[in-house]
């Protein structure tokens, strides 16, 4: 990695601003999955052992950006963080302003302070509208560390503007280094072949960049989820009322033609679990794609023949990257396809298997096979952008490695 590492810093007795990604799922004030908090602990513990004063910065969800909203407060994170650290972690009720400045001033070496959600301020997501927001955050510390891989594809203040104010003092944390090195080495530089990418999710348009980039890298491209029906319609298949992005049909046709000319095999569903409505998961049936999905019915998951087909492709691959569920995994029985993909990846121990964060990571966790996957990324959109472009804005802006 050609960027400054946390190991290159001399943080003893100094204040270090650490951008973490604590954007975790919360229900009724309880954290449902704390993997992103756990993933940041190596960086936090390393700095604590070196007697640094650590100021943690994170976002949570999508608040309006101009006021405090209790639903998006970082308060539920505090007890989890304290459990891992074994000592009290104060939460500043704001991330900027006099209260935050006082909290930072009182922070002693060897202790941790958590600042409230940076997205409560418009200057985080729209730094051009309020440049002073980044300036105030940067003023707290002597060093900056980015350990928030999952949000480093965004040019937000705490990820992109703040590190620019730390010349030769903006470094990558351990999680960031792990993500970049694993994804870079195993998916971009030297993927073992055959290399298969599995992409799910709803829209072709939101993933067209990464799809076209992958066509020059992969041997097989598996397309499913809502996006799969757009490709099927582009091939003149009858998909009933299934989710189709009409504006994505020309893009799908372009991808299919490029894949043909570049020798990449495209795999699409050959059958589907369909129903009139998704909510209850009742009255579903499996239908062949070739025979068509009738009007009034929608496909909500891949069928058993498609599971067998996709599983065979996975088993014949040496590298597999998966991003996006292949069905509505939140509603049984439409979770079976995604869980089957997760279990197939987990059982293929001889391959390099990478799950690109987001919903796919949630499915792997639900299937109980996270530990059997080579690498589960903490960033969905970030992993896709890294595969597409080979870099992320939040990492490119970090200080260069010392020679």
Swiss-Prot record:
Pathway in which the depicted protein is active: Carbohydrate degradation; glycolysis; pyruvate from D-glyceraldehyde 3-phosphate: step 2/5
UniProt-listed InterPro entries: Phosphoglycerate_kinase, Phosphoglycerate_kinase_CS, Phosphoglycerate_kinase_N, Phosphoglycerate_kinase_sf
Pfam families per UniProt: PGK (PF00162)
GO molecular function: ADP binding; ATP binding; phosphoglycerate kinase activity
Compartments where found: Cytoplasm
Reaction(s) this enzyme catalyzes, per UniProt: (2R)-3-phosphoglycerate + ATP = (2R)-3-phospho-glyceroyl phosphate + ADP
Sorted UniProt keywords: ATP-binding, Cytoplasm, Glycolysis, Kinase, Nucleotide-binding, Transferase
Coiled coil: none
GO biological process: gluconeogenesis; glycolytic process
EC number from the UniProt entry: 2.7.2.3
PROSITE patterns assigned: PGLYCERATE_KINASE
Residues that, per the record, bind substrate: 21-23, 36, 59-62, 119, 154
Binding site for ATP: 207, 299, 330, 357-360
Entry's Gene Ontology cellular component terms: cytosol
Entry's family note: Belongs to the phosphoglycerate kinase family.
Quaternary structure (record): Monomer.
Name of this protein: Phosphoglycerate kinase
Originating organism: Chlamydia muridarum (strain MoPn / Nigg)
Lineage, uppermost ranks: Bacteria, Pseudomonadati, Chlamydiota, Chlamydiia, Chlamydiales
């Amino acid at each position: 990695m050609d960027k400054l590492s946390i190991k290159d810093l001399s943080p003893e007795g100094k204040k270090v601003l650490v951008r973490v990604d604590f954007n975790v799922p919360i229900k009724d004030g309880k954290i449902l999955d704390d993997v992103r908090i756990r993933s940041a602990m190596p960086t936090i513990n390393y700095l604590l052992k070196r007697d640094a004063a650590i100021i943690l910065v994170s976002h949570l969800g999508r608040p309006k950006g101009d006021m405090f909203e209790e639903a998006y407060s970082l308060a539920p994170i505090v007890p989890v963080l304290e459990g891992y650290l074994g000592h009290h972690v104060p939460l500043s009720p704001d991330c900027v302003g006099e209260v935050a400045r006082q909290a930072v001033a009182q922070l002693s070496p060897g202790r941790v302070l958590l600042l409230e959600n940076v997205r409560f301020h418009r200057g985080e997501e729209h730094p051009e509208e309020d440049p002073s927001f980044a300036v105030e955050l940067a003023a707290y510390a002597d060093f900056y560390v980015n350990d928030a891989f999952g949000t480093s594809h965004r040019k937000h203040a705490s990820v992109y503007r703040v590190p620019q104010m730390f010349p030769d003092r903006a470094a990558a944390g351990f999680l960031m280094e792990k993500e970049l090195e694993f994804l870079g080495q195993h998916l971009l530089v030297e993927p073992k072949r055959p290399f298969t990418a599995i992409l799910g999710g709803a829209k072709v348009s939101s993933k067209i960049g990464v799809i076209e980039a992958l066509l020059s890298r992969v041997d097989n491209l598996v397309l499913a989820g809502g996006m799969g029906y757009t490709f099927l319609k582009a091939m003149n298949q009858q998909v009933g009322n299934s989710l189709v992005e009409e504006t994505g049909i020309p893009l799908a046709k372009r991808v299919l033609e490029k894949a043909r000319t570049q020798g990449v095999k495209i795999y699409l569903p050959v059958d589907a679990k369909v129903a009139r409505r998704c909510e209850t998961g009742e009255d579903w049936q499996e239908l062949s794609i070739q025979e068509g999905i009738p009007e009034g019915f929608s496909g909500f998951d891949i069928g058993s023949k498609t599971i067998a087909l996709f599983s065979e492709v996975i088993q014949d691959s040496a590298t597999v990257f998966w991003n996006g569920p292949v069905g509505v995994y939140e509603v049984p029985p439409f979770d079976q396809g995604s869980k089957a993909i997760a279990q197939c990846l987990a059982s293929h121990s001889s391959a390099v298997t990478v799950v690109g964060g987001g919903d796919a990571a949630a499915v792997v966790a639900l299937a109980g096979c996270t530990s059997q996957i080579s690498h589960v990324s903490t960033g969905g959109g970030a992993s896709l952008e890294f595969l597409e472009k080979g870099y992320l804005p939040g990492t490119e802006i970090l200080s260069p490695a010392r020679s």
